[in-house]
Swiss-Prot record:
Function noted in UniProt: Thrombin-like snake venom serine protease that has fibrinogen-clotting activity (217 NIH units/mg). It releases fibrinopeptide A and a small amount of fibrinopeptide B from fibrinogen alpha (FGA) and beta (FGB).
GO cellular component: extracellular region
Chief site of localization: secreted
Name the record gives this protein: Thrombin-like enzyme jerdonobin
């Protein structure tokens, strides 16, 4: 899937931001 890695990275950063709280 083209662009799938980018989406995963964005989701990963989002989850990390949530856990950072």
């Amino acid at each position: 899937v083209i662009g799938g890695d980018e989406c995963n990275i964005n989701e990963h950063r989002f989850l990390v931001a949530l856990y950072d709280f």
